[in-house]
Amino acid sequence: MPSQPEQLVDAEADSVPPPSAPQMPSKASRILLGLSLVLIAANLRPVFSSVSVLLPEIIDGTGMSSLAAGVLTTLPVVCLGAFAPFAPRLAQRFGAERVLLAVLVVLTIGTALRGVGSFWSLYMGATLAGAAIAMGNVLLPGVVKRDFPKTAAIMTGLYTMALCGGAASAAGFTIPIKNMLGGSWNLALAFWAIPAALVLVLWLPQALRSKHNVAHSGFRVVGLWKDPLAWQVTLFMGLQSSTAYIVFGWLAPILRERGMSPAAAGGLVSFSIMAQVVTCLLIPSIAVRQKSQSFINVFLCACASLALIGFLYLPQWSFWILAIIQGIGQGGLIAAAMMVIVLRSPDSHTAAHLSGMAQCVGYILAAIGPLVVGMIHSATGSFAASGLFFVILWIGASINGWLSGRARHVGARTINKEA
């Protein structure tokens, strides 16, 4: 079984020659590199949670329907799946550091574009930001693993905390920022371009200094897309991600419909996301010690889904308890879905390709969740009717979580093109 440092999937595993870590002559330059990577990670989630807490204001300000709002929350998730496959090839051609620089540029522009406040600028900004985040999602774990091989476990923890911290910060602070900016929801959305721009300035000299030899793919993996286990891993990734992006996109509006104030709803979502950190860090070390991860996966699905259903029907006094349960379940599912990719793969090349399959198909599947919730709300005028849909997601994720958790490898073969 892989040990803790092997959790991160290297998207450039097939590259020939393999990418090498940059030369860092001083401890300070190494600390700066680590800090920069963590800060990049922190900017990969505010796009989602900042929209969520302002969705009622966006609907009122633009006149869009709940269905159109569902499309707005869905667009970045679709982009996660659509653009993820391009990241490894771009890294082979230009180097991961320079691609991450482009990620920050596009992310800053896309986030700032939301400040225009028009219907189409919101959609365009969501698309650009989603495309950038897709690239960052794929490349950043491999860069962390490559540049910090001796401290991969610590960097994995910091990387995970940064992802959750960025999402939680946007959920918790966007409403206060809106109030500080005179009640302007569009400026509050655009505000999150500032931290992305600051990290861009920090990363720019490091990216330009990096040396890169043009690489090509020296390996191919055959049989993966026909393998039932690979599809079970992919469906598990997609269905648990669907629940996650429903939380990002719709939990705050659900809480506001149930009677919470905008600030309190944002604070509760932020609290729930921070609860994800605990199981994000703990589940991998627990999972690798088990022959099968099936029970863990099913248990986490129950926590995440039942708590989400509880927000629809249970009294308001229970919401903070539900937030903890949902955060524990969802955070564990994020880690578990990534772990089964590694554990079901016989080698690093298969893991990279299985990760690509799970992200490409899984995120497109995940995008259906927020869209369906928007459709249900548009048709019924209430979120209460979404409960049945949440149950369907729960059952689907549990079945595929159980199947993908079994101790076996996907039936795919790695072929060395150079041999």
PLM region spans:
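Residue-level signature of mid-helix packing/kink "hotspots" within the transmembrane helices
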Residues: S49, V77-P85, A168, I273-L281, ...
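Extracytoplasmic gate region of multi-pass secondary transporters
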Residues: V51-S52, P228-C280
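Conserved MFS/SLC helix-loop-helix module at the cytosolic interface between two early adjacent transmembrane helices
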Residues: A82-W120
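Helix-to-loop junctions at the C-terminal end of transmembrane segments
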Residues: F83-G95, T279-S292
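Helix-loop-helix hairpin linking two adjacent transmembrane segments in secondary transporters
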Residues: F119, K150-T151, G157-A207
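Cytoplasmic helix-loop-helix junction between adjacent transmembrane helices
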Residues: A126-M161
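C-terminal transmembrane helical hairpin of 12-TM major facilitator-type secondary transporters
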Residues: K291-A337
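A late C-terminal transmembrane helix in Major Facilitator Superfamily
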Residues: S348-F383, F390
